[in-house]
């Protein structure tokens, strides 16, 4: 399985790093992709991250080889993600093909930007739910069809494990849980 992890200046540091880390522990190939042209990219708490690739360097055929995508939160980062027309096009294309769309914290509003959340159950950071035309649930993590959402940084591990379970099954999820001493 292959996932695109999109991020931008101001994306939430821990949500991004924890999710990428746990997906890679599950042997999911994760390509970190900056929608910015800056390198490194400064995340919301001034941690600088060098992307594997910049979105401007990826062709559509290469992008379409991936099985899904991940979007971290962070107020400024989410605003910057929404500014990328190319990212919006990729999200729509992935949804049309029922590929995984995963977003945490304020990032479900990026999915809502193209009405993808309409009629779907979701969770997000408190206060952002009004920007999403979907069915809000005040829970830590949620899956509805091909969409996985997480409420906040506090739920980053649960969010990552739900993505792993969705893509690879419960055995892979349990293996990662055991490896991080989540379930002893």
Regions inferred by a protein language model and the residue ranges of each:
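N-terminal beta-loop-helix "entrance" segment that forms/cooperates
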Residues: 33-54
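Short glycine-/small-residue-rich flexible loop motifs, especially phosphate/cofactor-binding loops
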Residues: 20, 39, 108
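Active-site-adjacent pocket-lining segments in enzyme domains
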Residues: 4-5, 11, 26-34, 53, ...
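A short, Lys/Arg-enriched amphipathic alpha-helix followed by its capping loop at the start of a domain
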Residues: 18-28
């Amino acid at each position: 399985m292959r996932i695109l992890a999109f991020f931008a200046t101001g994306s939430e540091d821990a949500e991004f790093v924890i999710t990428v880390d746990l997906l890679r522990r599950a042997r999911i190939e994760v390509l970190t992709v900056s929608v910015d042209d800056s390198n490194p990219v400064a995340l919301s708490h001034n941690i600088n991250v060098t992307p594997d690739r910049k979105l401007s360097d990826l062709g559509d055929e290469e992008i379409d080889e991936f099985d899904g995508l991940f979007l971290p939160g962070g107020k400024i980062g989410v605003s910057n993600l929404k500014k990328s027309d190319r990212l919006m096009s990729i999200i729509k294309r992935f949804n049309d093909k029922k590929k995984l769309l995963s977003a945490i914290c304020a990032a479900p509003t990026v999915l809502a930007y193209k009405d993808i959340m309409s009629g779907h159950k979701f969770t997000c950071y408190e206060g952002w739910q009004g920007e999403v035309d979907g069915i809000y649930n005040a829970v830590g993590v949620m899956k509805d069809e091909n969409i996985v959402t997480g409420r906040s940084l506090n739920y980053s591990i649960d969010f990552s494990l739900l993505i792993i379970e969705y893509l690879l099954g419960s055995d892979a999820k349990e293996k990662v849980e055991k490896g991080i001493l989540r379930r002893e």
